[in-house]
Amino acid sequence: MKHIRNFSIIAHIDHGKSTLSDRLIQECGGLSDREMAAQVLDSMDIERERGITIKAQSVTLDYKAQDGETYQLNFIDTPGHVDFSYEVSRSLAACEGALLVVDAGQGVEAQTLANCYTALEMDMDVVPVLNKIDLPQADPERVADEIEDIVGIEAADAVRCSAKTGIGIKDVLEVIVAQIPSPEGDPEGPLQALIIDSWFDSYQGVVSLVRIKNGVLRKGDKFKVMSTGQNYNADRVGIFTPKQTDTTELKTGEVGFIIAGIKEIHGAPVGDTLTHAKHGADKPLAGFKKVKPQVYAGLFPISTDDYESFRDALNKLSLNDASLFFEPETSSALGFGFRIGFLGLLHMEIIQERLEREYNLDLITTAPTVVYEIVKTSGETIYVDNPSDLPAINNIEEMREPIVETNILVPKEYLGNVITLCVEKRGVQKNLVYHGNQVALTYELPMAEVVMDFFDRLKSTSRGYASLEYNFIRFEPADMVRLDILINGDRVDALAMIIHKGLIRSKGLALVNKMKELIPRQMFDIAVQAAVGSQIIARSSIKAMRKDVTAKCYGGDVSRKKKLLNKQKEGKKRMKQVGNVEVPQEAFLAVLKLND
């Protein structure tokens, strides 16, 4: 056991986590040079295309150190995005230490901090590594000072390496062996294994990635899942080297996979504990805290026949992505679908893209909303994440919106732009500290503003240099109202949104004008209105197409023409009563893109 090292690689987006893991795999001979591909561990196509890591992946390597001993390194490559920070905390639960990778050119960024603090809270040993020292703009001295100054861990003798060219990779491996502690646990005790991750394989059923805390799990053992009490047989156990490699047993301190032919999707939930069916452990390990979704949106299949396959797809995805929450929803405009909870907008985009690619579905998304706390006049408190569930205005005593604490790191030349943006988003400044060339800003912002397009706007006002991380702190009373869109006097539930009172006029007008462009002309006039309660605040009309009914009259009496025109008028009136207007897909998307 003293030769096992479990660690995660944590870093800000694009500081070279995945490339560093590629080098470690190559150095330890996990894959031959022929099998190496850039970003070996980013197994999804989306990950490769966008160049981001979404799922944490684990690898087991053997490394012969300079002291002549062979060490088993289990490491987990983690995502860097704010939206996936829970993936990071999950990976850390399986480790004793973490490599904090910092780009020697960019320096410390917000996500570096956030992930590092997560690790320190879990009593991890954090080992700083300065990456990209081959770049002309690399300044390892300055960055080492920054790490000590902002993060507060020793970095004077941090390892310097370049994952791209392979300089210093040996040193990284030596530091891992020297500085990261070996796992603790009782090899003789009853089995306790923590499920770090699970995914569904259509041939093998559920594949679970586990970390053995105590005891030994052998192939063919009968084990039970502690939360459900179900018993299974361990058909295959093994490790990823990154290829799936079967072994006969997983010992205390090791990280590996287990396949037990579990067919029901929620058979082995992430964060659960496995133990032997006979003489097992009495109590489960401390799992992970359940992540609460921050953003909700409705997703609807374009053709109603896809509803069942959509549900299956969601079930399979939720096994792999423990933060996904969904419940059935119906909309008069869009039919049957699901209300889905996400961790942020990037997460939402990725999930939608995975559903469309991996499961061949065509989906419509409604505007994302956050959760509001509402105190009704009866004194009851409810939580609403769907604008159409909002009680009538006269039943609401008080509406409270979620506030997040946002930490932004920005080079000082862009400070002004960023402050202007935060003020525009109704932010309250809490703190401002200078660290050398960087400024650390702390703002309290309404989550609804952060979720919509804050990240993109922040990047564009700071030329991509600012970075942010945020977490929910509390609900705060706010003047929020529901804005409805009426088409010919009928509410379109999928277009409703909850917004701040100060924005109704501008948002209402913008929406109405956008709808006017996007809804095709019909044979009768269409009124598009924006309303709050019963008060109409903006309106525009889509004019009818007309047929020239008098074209066939040459000369003759004017009353003949009048008769034909009146007949047309009657027909249009009748049509307007029964005619319904199809709202095209683009109109729903327009709500999301209103700020452009």
Swiss-Prot record:
Keyword hit for Mitochondrion: no
Domain of life: Bacteria
Keywords tagged on the record: Cell inner membrane, Cell membrane, GTP-binding, Hydrolase, Membrane, Nucleotide-binding, Protein biosynthesis
Predominant location: membrane
Pfam name, any one: GTP_EFTU
Reaction catalyzed: GTP + H2O = GDP + phosphate + H(+)
Function, in words: Required for accurate and efficient protein synthesis under certain stress conditions. May act as a fidelity factor of the translation reaction, by catalyzing a one-codon backward translocation of tRNAs on improperly translocated ribosomes. Back-translocation proceeds from a post-translocation (POST) complex to a pre-translocation (PRE) complex, thus giving elongation factor G a second chance to translocate the tRNAs correctly. Binds to ribosomes in a GTP-dependent manner.
Full protein name: Elongation factor 4
One of the record's GO molecular function terms: translation elongation factor activity
EC number, as in UniProt: 3.6.5.n1
Family: Belongs to the TRAFAC class translation factor GTPase superfamily. Classic translation factor GTPase family. LepA subfamily.
Lineage summary: Bacteria, Pseudomonadati, Pseudomonadota, Gammaproteobacteria, Alteromonadales
InterPro entries: EF-4, EFG_III/V, EFG_V-like, EFTu-like_2, G_TR_CS, LepA_C_sf, LepA_CTD, LepA_IV
Keyword Hydrolase among UniProt keywords: yes
Gene label: lepA
Gene Ontology CC terms, in alphabetical order: plasma membrane
Binding site for GTP: D14, H15, G16, K17, S18, T19, N131, K132, I133, D134
Membrane topology category: Peripheral membrane protein
